[in-house]
């Protein structure tokens, strides 16, 4: 089981601080004892507490696209991610992790 925290900033409001994300993650640490991370920008804040199942060492979240324009947190399991990944690799996608979450990001 994992935990996700998030906040979307209304137009004209101040950007959220990463410290707020860390405090939000602290509340849900019991949901994901293995790893945690925070993304904060001027529009949103995403927090993730992870129970590592797939790519235990390399599946840190939030996960970013190669150009850092897209960020994802994901709680779930893609059972056919290896098949999907193989198809994406055939189409030229390059993966940085072994995580099923990155398959979503690359698709």
Q: For each predicted feature, which ranges?
A:
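N-terminus-centric sequence/structural signature that marks the extreme N-terminus
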Residues: 1-107
């Amino acid at each position: 089981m994992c935990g996700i925290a998030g906040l979307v900033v209304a137009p004209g409001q101040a950007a959220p601080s990463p410290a707020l994300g860390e405090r939000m993650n602290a509340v849900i640490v019991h949901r994901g004892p293995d790893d945690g991370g925070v993304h904060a920008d001027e529009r949103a804040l995403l927090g993730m507490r992870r129970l590592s199942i797939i790519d235990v060492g390399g599946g840190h979240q939030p996960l970013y696209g190669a150009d850092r324009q897209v960020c994802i947190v994901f709680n779930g399991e893609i059972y056919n991610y290896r098949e999907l990944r193989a198809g994406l690799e055939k189409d030229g996608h390059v993966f940085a992790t072994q995580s099923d979450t990155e398959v979503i990001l690359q698709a």
